[in-house]
Structure formats: structure tokens, C-alpha cells
Amino acid sequence: MIELFNIDLLSYTVQTAETAPTHSYTIYWLILLGSMLLSWLVSARMKSRFSEYSQISIPVTGRQVAEQMLKDNHITDVKVISTPGHLTDHYNPADKTVNLSESVYNSNSIAAAAVAAHEVGHAVQHAQAYHWLGLRSALVPIVQLSSNLVGIVLMIGIVLLAMGGSPWVLGLGIGLFAVTTAFAFITLPVEFDASARALKWL
């Protein structure tokens, strides 16, 4: 997912950008900060909706919803397991597991059911060899590497630029962030399709 950086780093970044000896990176700063703001807004909206629909109870848990949807789609080689964290739900095609967060796995709310069904939607995509899922899976290692490096590279780049050094390190950091941002847009068809499959089943 797109990484949200520390507010202090954002503040320092803006101040440095204003005093930097070059103006050639202005557009990159705008794109970077705009993308980070957008990702924060999307994340906040998602958490708000999840919290709202978590208050509406149903007779089954997220785990039961996931298991029943797998059964109805004749998928027998995928396991439903619990994973630590909040909204850390995902489908892992490598070991064929639907990983439901603690707030979904044992919860009997509409929100939990929707999230569980969405993740099983990815399992159905995998079982049916949905091509966009294959592309996303192939890009995951690259995106994970970019996500791990982007913070430190951006910080080093900012420091070097403030000291009058070459901006290429900062450019590299912005490029790494662009990779994670592009990944989010590339995988939109996968997410929309998984949601459509979940809604159809529900």
C-alpha cells in the first residue's frame, strides 16, 4: 500500500523545498505531497466507513462468511486464517490463505462480512486465473522493496539537497514513491473486480 510518512518529515520537507537552491523539483514536491494527502484521505474514509458498519450485527462472523464463500465457489485448497492488526486483511496467493485481521475474523458485523467476502474475491480471481491479479502478484516484490527504501532515501536526499549537494538522491526517493503510487492505480481493476465478486455473492 501507499506509505503515509511522519508529519515532522512532511514539515521538514516543505521547509527544505522552499529554501533549496533549485526549483526544478517543485512539480515533484507537489505530486509527492498531493499523493500523500490523497492516500491519507482514502485511508481515513475507509476506516470511518468500517467503523460505521461495524456497529451493525449479523448472525455470522467474518471467518464464517469467508469459508462459506470459498465453499460456494468450489475452492477447497484455500485456508482462512487470522492475522494481527487492524484492517490488515489480504489474500496471499503464494500460500493460498485468506488472512483476516482480528477485527474481522471473529466479528459478526456487516463490515467484517464485506471485508471477508472481498478478500475471498481475490481467492476466486486466483482460482480462475484472473490476469490482473497475476500482474499485481508479479509487481509485489518490487513495490515492497520500494516501500522499504523510500523513507530513508527521501530523508538522505533532503539532507543532501539542503547542504547544496546533488538532487539525484532526492529524485531517486521520489521515483521510489512514484512506484508505490503507480502500483495502487495499476491494481485498481483487481480491487474493483474482487468487490464486484463479493457483492454478487453477498
Predicted feature descriptions by range:
Residues 2-22, 26, 42-146, 182-202:
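Polar-ligand-bearing catalytic/cofactor-coordination segments
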Residues 14-20, 158-166:
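Helix-interface capping motifs at the ends of transmembrane segments in multi-pass membrane proteins
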Residues 21-31, 165-176:
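Hydrophobic alpha-helical transmembrane segments
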Residues 31-35, 180:
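Alpha-helical transmembrane segments of integral membrane proteins
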Residues 35-42:
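N-terminal glycine-rich anion-binding loops that anchor highly charged ligand groups
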Residues 125-132, 153-163:
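Membrane-helix exit/interface motif
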Residues 145-155:
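Core segments of transmembrane alpha-helices
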Residues 162-163, 170-187, 202:
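Long, well-structured alpha-helical subdomains associated
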